[in-house]
Amino acid sequence: MSTEGGMSFLSEQDRMNESEKDDHDFLFFNPLAQPFSKWYELHKRLNLFPWWIRYNLGSAKEANLKDRILEVGKNLGLSTIWMNKIIRHSISEFSKKGLGFDYYGYHNIYHELEATYFTLLAASGQNKDNNFDLKDIKYLFLSALFHDYDPLKSFDKPNEDEVEWFIRKDKKIREWIEEEGLNIDIMMAMIHRTAYPFRGKIASGAIERMNHLFSKAGIPMEDEKTRKYYHDLGWFLSVSERVAGYALGNFDRAIELARLNAHGLGWHPSLINQESVKYFSVLKQEKEMLDRILNSVSEKYKQNFLENISKFKEAWIQEVEIKRSLRKNEISLIPVIEDKNVKIDPKIVNSIIDIRNDLNGPLLVNNKQDFAKSLSHPDTILVTLRVKEKDTMVIGFAKGGPLEQYRLRRGTNDANHGKKNTVFLESMYIRSGYWGEKGGHLLRLYFLTRSKELGYEYVTGYVHRDVLLRRSDKGEPIQLVQKYDPDKLDYYRIELNRFNYDPLF
């Protein structure tokens, strides 16, 4: 038996011996996959109760997506009752294990629902030469809905081996597979085909596992046609789930997805446009399947996808030009601590609100209306980042205030709450194109300086763990107060009287 990355795998001979056992036996086990505490799941259920009310009333966006899945699935011949109970189970399991609507990562339950809806849409538009039968549709439905089911993952990106472990361990999923006459090994082989990027060691490992699963499913090695058929069905799923979010939404949604993906991978914000262009370039290498899928959905979704690609390219070109201007000193950035005793120029206020409105996701601690009002609150600390040559041109800002005025993320308890000695830094926002040129460093430095001047002892907030560790390694007096896995959006605290205010720090 070989061991790799904390996982124990059976040898090939052991696998062959195991193939005679019941389909529900595991071919490998994950020693880290301990059951979630009942108290943890109860806590999640209680916290999610208001959302469940909205979901059951149909006002949550997940409920709308569920209804669209049921509609297209019914048209393809799937039982509404069967789909409904499986979707409900998936939402419940993802949510109570921390991967629900409040999870700050790309691979959350909404992505699973988007992937399922788009995959079924693409399947419904296949021509006669590529038509799927009802069993194929059932495989696609289940595989799309659970292809990222890895609640104990260490990173945002799931591990297909662990996904298989959790699916095989889930009694309800196994029963739904069996009652429809499906084979769990074929379903798992399709999910392994979603491994990304599908090249090099990742592809060879997935193919090896898929071949074993095909053998276990009773498909002999000689039956290359059937194996290729299910391999391609998994490929169809893989491309569909990667295209889904970028085809179903506009560029605002595409940017949100890119930011979530960047956060999960620990990228600096300055890499978002560049890496997004690379992502779509790699996808175009699968042109055969990509064209097949895009030609199977409505013109609206196809155009959404193509326009989003084009806009990412435009944003990257613009970003390159901005960086060139900054490095040639044609333009320069200056931070400004806004005086709360002086009314802010309406143009500056509008610029700040525009930057804020471009953002989405659970990092935003106020809604748009409350945010606008908070800019003029006497306790607000606001630092703007401007283009020196155009004084009123704001391209970023850092904003915060007394800790007591904020609701923290579930699970965060700050011992300083009520002591009025702590400032909460909401976040730092910079327009696309200006990241990576020390603007964020200047905003943060001036925000910390202003907080110290006002008599505060600490600054807290949420930041990706990799960023926090890098700052700690540089000697910053920064403390990790509350960890959050797998999204790694951790709560930190900085002790201001120990902070180095050297601008080059």
What are the functions of these language-model segments?
Residues 88-116, 150:
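Active-site flanking loop/helix segments enriched in acidic
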Residues 9-74, 106, 118-134, 146, ...:
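Divalent metal-dependent phosphate-bond-processing catalytic cores, especially two-metal-ion Mg2+/Mn2+ enzymes
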Residues 327-370, 384-386, 393:
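Short amphipathic alpha-helix that is part of the acyltransferase structural core
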Residues 427-430, 436-449:
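Conserved acetyl-CoA-binding loop-helix of GNAT-fold acetyltransferases
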Residues 112, 119, 160-216:
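Histidine- and acidic-residue-rich, metal-dependent catalytic cores
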Residues 115, 135-153, 163, 188-195:
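His-Asp-centered metal-binding catalytic motifs of divalent-metal-dependent phosphohydrolases/nucleases
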Residues 451-465:
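Conserved GNAT acetyl-CoA-binding A-motif
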Residues 390-427:
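Conserved acyl-donor/pantetheine-binding loop and adjacent beta-alpha core of acyl/acetyltransferases
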